[in-house]
Structures are given as C-alpha cells and as structure tokens.
UniProtKB/Swiss-Prot annotation:
Species the sequence originates in: Sinorhizobium fredii (strain NBRC 101917 / NGR234)
Source lineage: Bacteria, Pseudomonadati, Pseudomonadota, Alphaproteobacteria, Hyphomicrobiales
Transmembrane parts of this sequence: none
Gene3D superfamilies associated with the record: 1.10.520.10, Peroxidase, domain 2 (1.10.420.10)
GO BP: any one term: cellular response to hydrogen peroxide
Name under which the protein is recorded: Catalase-peroxidase
Subunit structure: Homodimer or homotetramer.
Cystine crosslinks: none
Pfam families found in the cross-reference section: peroxidase (PF00141)
Amino acid sequence: MDQKSDNAGKCPVAHTVPKGRSNRDWWPDQLDVQVLHQHSGLSDPMGKAFNYAEEFKKLDLEELKKDLHALMTESQDWWPADFGHYGGLFIRMAWHSAGTYRITDGRGGAGQGQQRFAPLNSWPDNANLDKARRLLWPIKQKYGNRISWADLMILTGNVALESMGFQTFGFAGGRADVWEPQELFWGPEGTWLGDERYSGERQLDEPLAAVQMGLIYVNPEGPNGNPDPVAAAREIRETFARMAMNDEETVALIAGGHTFGKTHGAGDPSFIGPDPEGGAIEDQGLGWKSTFGTGVGKDAITGGPEVTWSQTPTRWSNYFFENLFNYEWELTKSPAGAHQWKAKNADASIPDAFDASKKHVPTMLTTDLSLRFDPIYEKISRRFLENPDQFADAFARAWFKLTHRDMGPKVRYLGPEVPAEDLIWQDVIPAVDHKLVDENDVADLKGKVLASGLSVQELVSTAWASASTFRGSDKRGGANGARIRLAPQKDWEVNQPAQLARVLSVLEGIQKDFNTAHTGGKKISLADLIVLAGAAGVEKAAKAGGHDITVPFTPGRADASEAQTDAASFAALEPRADGFRNYVSRRRRQFMKPEEALVDRAQLLTLTAPELTVLVGGLRVVFTSRPEVLTNDFFVNLLDMGTQWSPMAEKEGVYEGRDRKTHEVKWTGTRVDLIFGSHSQLRALAEVYASSDAKEKFVGDFVAAWTKVMNADRFDLV
C-alpha cells in the first residue's frame, strides 16, 4: 500500500502530558531538603575539570573592555539606546544584579549571574533588563568561558560608568556562573508587588531586604505608591541597611546611579505583554513586549515614571544634587499615570532621549526627594552638593562595595583592576607571615590540648562555633581569622560565652608556649589551633568508640584584629537558631521552625542532606549514655520502635520519649532531633547510619563532613 495516512510523518509520542501535583503541592508545609542539592554537577555543562578562575586568567581584559566601550554607543533598532548611549541601561543591569544582596543571610547578589533565571529575570523591577543581556550576548559569545555572565554584567556596569567620564574604584573577577535558578525565599506573596512581608507597625520580616515582591529595594513612587518622600526615606534606610549600606553610601548610590540615563513610562502599563518567563516560545526569552506606539525608544514602557535627572545624562556631573536643591518640586504624573515630581517654574533644560530639538523640565522620583527632605540624608546630600570630589569618591567606593559585597575575602578577587586598598567590609584577614607547623608539631600540639583538662565537648563545640559561622552565600564567616575571640562573636549566647572564654584562655596559653619555644619563625595561629583542638577532640571521641582515625588538618589560617573587624557587620552572622547545637534563641524573634532553620544553616554551610544528617548525629549528646564518644547511638535510639514520643506540655518544642511497655521516660528531644525520624527523606538517611554495619561508615562520613566545615573558608586551598 502506498496510501498515506493522515498521521504519516508525525511523532508517535503524545506531547500533551498532564501535569501532576508535586509533593510540595500536596504537603506545602513539608520540610524542603531539596535546597541542599542545588547547583550539583548534574546541571553544570562545564564538567568537573573546568576551573573558572584559570579561564579568567586567560582573558584579555583590556580587549574586552574596548569591545564594551564600543557597544555603549552602537544603538540597535530593536532596542534603541537612550541619548545614543546604553550606559544608563547597563548601570541598572549591574545594580540590579548586585542589589538583591541581603546581609541577614548573605544570599542574593551578583555572584552567580542569577539575573538570567526566574524569578529575577521576570521581576517587575527588572523589566527590560533582558534587552541589556541580549545586547551583551555577542560579546559573551566572543569571549566564551573566559568571562562568566556574573562577571560580565558587573564589568559592563563599570565600563558604562567609565565611558561616561566616571573613575571607578576597581573591578574584581571571580564570579562563577551557575546553571539553574536558585531556590530562595524572596517573600510570602503570591502576586507581583505584594507586601505581605510586614508585621506590627510596618516591621519588615527577615531576611528580606525589599519592600515589595519583585522590587530590588523600594517603590520609587513611595511606600505602596504613596508619594511621601519622608516616609520613603524610612523604607530606603531600612532596605539599604539590610544590604549592608550606611546612610552616606545610600545617598551616594542613589544620586550616583541617577546621574545617568532615564526611566521609561511613555504610556499606560496595560500595553505591556508578559514577562520573559510567561512569554510565548517564539519570543525566545524576551519579555515585556509593548504595543504602545513602536514599543521601543521614545515609546518604551519599563515601569511607571518618566524621569530624566540630569542635563547631561551620559556624562558624570553634579547635576542631580544641583537640581534637587535648586528647585522646589510639585507632584505630577507620568504618561503612564505614575507619581513623580517636576521642578516648579523651571526652564526646559533636560534633553530628550530621542529628539535633539526637544527639552524637558527637570523631574525627580519620590525616592530622590527623600535625599532632600530626610534630615540625615539632606545633610549628606548638601555636603556632596558643595564637595563634588567627596561625592565622586563616595559613589566609587559604594559602587565597588555594592558590586563586590558577596564575593568574600580578597583572596578570591581576580584580575589586574583589583584595588590595593583593604576595606573593612571585606573582612580582612592578614597574610600568614610565619613558618607553618609540620606533622610532628601537630601531634605535639594535639597531645598538649588533650592534656589541658578541656573536655571533648569543649574542644568540639569551640571549633564548631568558630567554623560554622561560614556562609557559602557571601563567603563570610568561618574559622579563618579566629574572630570567635572578638566582639560580637565572643558574646553570642549560642557560643556559651563563659565556657568559650575559658576554652580560649587555655588554647591561648598553649599557643603562647608553642610560639615562644620555637625559633626560626615557626608559629601557630589561634585560628589554626582552635580547629586543631577540635580535630583532637573528634579523634579522642572516635577512639573511645573503637575507631582509630586521623582528622585531616591543614595549617595556614591567620588571626584577624579588632581593627580589621566591623563588629556591627558581623552581628548579622549571629544565628537565631543552630540545630547542630540544638540551640534556639528565646530573646530573638524566630521566622522559621527549628528544623527549617537547621536546613537553612546547612545550606549556608554548603552541606548536602547526608552531610547534614551525619553531622547532627555526631554532634549530638542526646539519645546516648556515652556523650563523649563518637557513635551512631543518636540514630539507633531515635529509630527504636520501643520508644513512643509525645510533646511536653511545660516545654514548647521539646518532646519526651517513653518506653512503650513501661512508659518510663527514656529520652527528651527537640523538633530538630525528631525530624530525622519524621521526615521521610531524612529518615531514610538516618536508617543508613543506624544500621548495625554502619558504625565505621558513620565515623568516616562524620570526619569528612566535619573537615568540610572546618575548611569551608579556606579559599587558598581551592
């Protein structure tokens, strides 16, 4: 037969597959452990051998910057450049890439190039930044793996500033891309621009650092669109502080960024199509297609306001402050219907972005006027008005901080434009200036530590307290620097200050004796000794359980000074809860259940679910009659079906386990303990370590996970 059926040549596989409900849909309150397995090698196309730092070193940065300079004025018909220069657009792209950073948990920021992915690529505040990245694609394509998207977006912001006459403070590469969206709590709202993140009298929930869902910081029209500059100033101060910026840095950033470019509110926002993630397949990831006029150039709609701040929007100047203070301002609305302000009785002195024959009167956003009508901001703004050189220096430094805040210590910085000056927000650690200890010294020091009278619990808890401050999000914290001996960490409740002071005193004595006794420049830092003492404690506990092991130790840490430590900044690292130590603060408001806080801290420590599980089991001194022995007793006794658990009426969050037959109390535990028997995935892992043949595996896995935490901030070892 040669008769063709109607289905000839068609794929035999049905493509309309019903979409089922996920486990999260069925059980929305279920503890999410999958966040511990983000950005695995399974999603990375580069392979294990790829080393971005080595690739970046091959980059001809000067050639790349020349290409970026040329791009600034190569206007494209599909997205024309305002004033013939893309500088303002690229500054906004870089700002919004970095500006998601929040100091409370160190998440967000420019470090992974997350602006490429949902939800950030579709936030209302990031409207039309997809065009900025598409303009960059030919350059990214040319330089390939030698420059990540994360680095390229920040570098392009720098080049934009430089191409418009501004002297930047510097640039460091080293931001490696990831290849999937980051699962991150951006707020509880289910709609864009929702603001269900407040409690009490407009108290913003932690760790959030923006006032509404889908905004970087604040609503430029004012709180919830209310055009009140003074009220807006309060929200600016709160959100910028949560991004680690003080008042001077805040003023400099707002004024500096608004020295260039314009906003786009040419028409009613109803003309705008879906965002990139909601667009049609033929749109190829471009969103916000507008049917207003041409949809681009003079007809572009990005947000609501239609504002140009400066008489020279493609050149660095002091016009922002001159206009801010030289005029009185009256409320008006943009063509899009958004609140904005125009100068009273002012001549038309602001150029049009696309018609050289047109001029406009100066305009400002509500949040711009905050810099004049808030008394603290006004004082700073007037100083910058009268001292343009101070303004330029403050903006250069604040911009560098904004774009590098989440990169961690300077040892991670790459490239020829890294500033020589050390800045306190970089959590400076001095270079090691002495000969390091060798294997014989390590053995000798372990012996002295174990003979000092300090218990296994004291040694292990002190090392954990020192190292577990590390945050993989912004690469802060960790054992290097020994900042556990400095304020504020030495006084944190979770660190048991009285015990900590005693342990540190003993270790400092051992350190002093060793350093005094050795000639030839050999020394051990307290940072190294704290970790070494913890290793000695783990080894002793393992030996007591019948396992003769050696915990890996690599010296090379240094001790930071008080002068190198911003105590206020480090206060953000204090845990509200630490499930590894069964700690929940009673004096600070909790935003998560204890078990959620445990997973959150594990994710900050870059731990996997198995690593989380084995560490909790090893660090516990509950569910065992051998508290200073490294055993799997925690898992064995937790999973014992001879025990029945019930909440204690007099202690919230505490449970008692009774013998099912005698009803006698055998154990007490917390939600963090019991989650390893309740949560199906964690229970599966607990069963591995509770098995009769798992004792050796448990010890080996614990030591590996312990060492990972101790070395989490050792970027010099990578």
